[in-house]
């Protein structure tokens, strides 16, 4: 045996990962049914977070499980260039150095970002290795590598030639901080308190006025009309009249449009088509002009008159002051409304009309909708199917151009000489129409998600017809979070059908969001994040992985507390110590058929078959928590607490050979079942077992042996467990030392010698048989044909009765408190799932103990 006395993960993890990579275990073997996953590529903006750790753990469980089942497994790793996020991060870094992107210029800035990418890609790889991910590093990809760049250009040109990519002047979401357009999906709408301002717009040549309500008075500088609903009786006679725009002294018409909500404000609204998407649509219907009043930094431009140069919030203050001075501000109300924010920097988005590149999505989405409707592609949990379809039914064109420097440059060139637009897969140096070399490439880059949408097939070599693409596309499952169903999942499905004529994957498993122990989203601003790499270094990678798996229940977020990692570090120690016990007791071990089995042998082997079935079925169904919980309960509660303890009866006898073989079989099988969850620990222990195999990584997944399922043995042994627990409980409540031999009387059915020896060994009992209940005894177990009593003679019974009554009273108060807690809606909605589970467990334990104490008290009264 080559095992230390304690589990030290730091000594075994690096050793085994390097060995696995060196041996090529993570590469596909080339035979068998393919099982393929492409990793959701982490952004190169910093360290991976706990959400990544969950995502990687669940994927690795699937891959290791399928590899052991004989599948031809391929897990493709890679990283995302993350255009806007990376550019922001590098700009912050440059700012700390007293530099700016503009000072450096585009070429030098891109050089610095490539250095950044190299550094963080290396760090991300190291972090993924730390988590034990069995990815094939020889196939690592990057969303901005040469192969992906070629794929991106081909897709762009193809869609453009089919009329599905177009350039146009439309209302878009502009981030003044990031200085780029965002897609609708990149805008986070946050409910905020605000003011609703009621402003008088006087009729031309009259002292009368109409009152409009607005949350953005600064935008009135760009107003071109006032609109009312044609069905609104209050405004029947004013359509076609004009009003004078306050502060700007510009006449604007009053129009009618059914979009206007008569219930909002006064039922009359200002129309600012250059800065509101709904107003934009109204203006197009009524052929109104567009007056843009903001520049790229959301400051008022020359169209704003004397307010030019003010930022939007300064302008709001100034406009309100002037409106009030001039008597135009009627009143102000408090309201709540949703405000769009940039998903990267949190700045408030400014709607603007700009020339941008778009993908026409309606026709592209049809096949992607059908695939999910007919379950050609399956969402797990199923409720995410409705979320996906709702978005797809209401899909809008995708704005794909970004005013950034880092990313895939739009593959479009413009001839300065003849104004020709050239869309090409290769760089253009000369105009194909006029021959001029005065050519400029489009300044914009493509949305990061454009390249990510091609990930399942571009990582396998597309547009080249590679062996990998032929063999491993479509992939098997995508494991991801719900927050990128629209950004990524939907677009991958669309592009897969468009360019491969096949789905990109069969299953989409949507995992949980990790929150802190109070249920809050983990974030830098709250300072409540838990770093997975720090946890791996502190507790070991296997306990971190097992913790994440055991809490990965479908349909509920994970409320994570660091102490959970310590709990499953203790489980890892338990596995280590159990393995040491088995190995220490293998003197003269020889493999032999499992014949002449004891009751305990038959029981544990039967339970083992059932845990094989449960774990296998749970992994197939993505029920990772059920698989992990079943393994935990089997190994700790059944194998360690009962079988190993019972084996001590035999290991020093002549009959130890069979017990040794059962111990080896159960430990070997358990380690193989544990391997997808705890790869390092399972490999280290498995290598010390007297079993044949090169590595647990490529060992066979356990199969159920139905000949070993024995319901009768389970029933009989579990009855003994109840008797032993009953005796232990009585001894504990009566303050009898656990190891003190105590007289135990059995009335009714006689036990066989084997059963008696288990009870005596595991409960410190001396068994006698009686024909009636003896005096001075406490009941330990009752069944239809058997009663078991513990002798309490010699104890001060009156004193024990008083003590028991006091304990019962105390427990009843605890029970009432737990019941009150579990009926509190506030506790149930806000407490972590683990805290609720603990409270229920505590209540169950209290009720069990009350039952025992009341039984003993009744016996003594």
From Swiss-Prot:
Keywords: Aminoacyl-tRNA synthetase, ATP-binding, Coiled coil, Cytoplasm, Ligase, Nucleotide-binding, Protein biosynthesis. Signal peptide: none annotated. One of its GO terms (biological process) is valyl-tRNA aminoacylation. Transmembrane segments: none annotated. The keyword Repeat does not apply. One of its GO terms (cellular component) is cytosol. A motif ('KMSKS' region) lies at residues 521-525. Its EC number is 6.1.1.9. Its main location: cytoplasm. It holds the Pfam family Val_tRNA-synt_C. It catalyses: tRNA(Val) + L-valine + ATP = L-valyl-tRNA(Val) + AMP + diphosphate. Belongs to the class-I aminoacyl-tRNA synthetase family. ValS type 1 subfamily. This is Valine--tRNA ligase. It comes from Pseudothermotoga lettingae (strain ATCC BAA-301 / DSM 14385 / NBRC 107922 / TMO).
